[in-house]
């Protein structure tokens, strides 16, 4: 069976979408191709890398990328992770489903916020797998 494509989008492709891509590949990698991107690029946040390393997932090789129209238009599901991305997501073809899963932005906040948001994203992806 061909894998489906899941595209996580947030503002800067720095924290939330990077962690979601890491979790997604870890949890859904056998059935989904998982990517992430941003409306802008802010670089991968080192604390996001460290937070994911803490749960055994390596995202240190990830890059901060702008939305790729080819991936976007060929996705089965696009998930926005912040209201900015939800409001500014490009128009999608009718075959692409879109969902919004809002998470707080941990950037510039305490380490515990990175851990909390990381765990919330992981839980959401675990729940998604059960659908």
UniProtKB/Swiss-Prot annotation:
The keyword Oxidoreductase applies. Its main location: cytoplasm. It is an enzyme of class 1 (oxidoreductase). The active site is at 10 (nucleophile), 82 (nucleophile), 89 (nucleophile). It comes from the Bacteria. Disulfide bonds join 10-82, 82-89. It is found in: Cytoplasm. Catalyzes the reduction of arsenate [As(V)] to arsenite [As(III)]. This is Arsenate reductase. It comes from Macrococcus caseolyticus (strain JCSC5402).
């Amino acid at each position: 069976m061909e894998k489906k494509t899941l595209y996580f989008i947030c503002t800067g492709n720095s924290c939330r979408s990077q962690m979601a891509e890491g979790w997604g590949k870890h949890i859904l990698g056998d059935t989904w191709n998982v990517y992430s991107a941003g409306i802008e690029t802010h670089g991968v946040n080192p604390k996001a890398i460290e937070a994911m390393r803490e749960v055994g997932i390596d995202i240190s090789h990830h890059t901060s990328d702008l939305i790729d129209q080819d991936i976007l238009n060929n996705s089965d599901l696009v998930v926005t992770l912040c209201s900015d991305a939800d409001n500014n997501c490009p128009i999608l073809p009718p075959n692409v489903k879109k969902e919004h899963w809002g998470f707080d932005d941990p950037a510039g906040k305490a380490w515990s916020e990175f851990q909390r948001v990381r765990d919330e994203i992981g839980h959401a992806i675990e729940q998604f797998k059960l659908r």
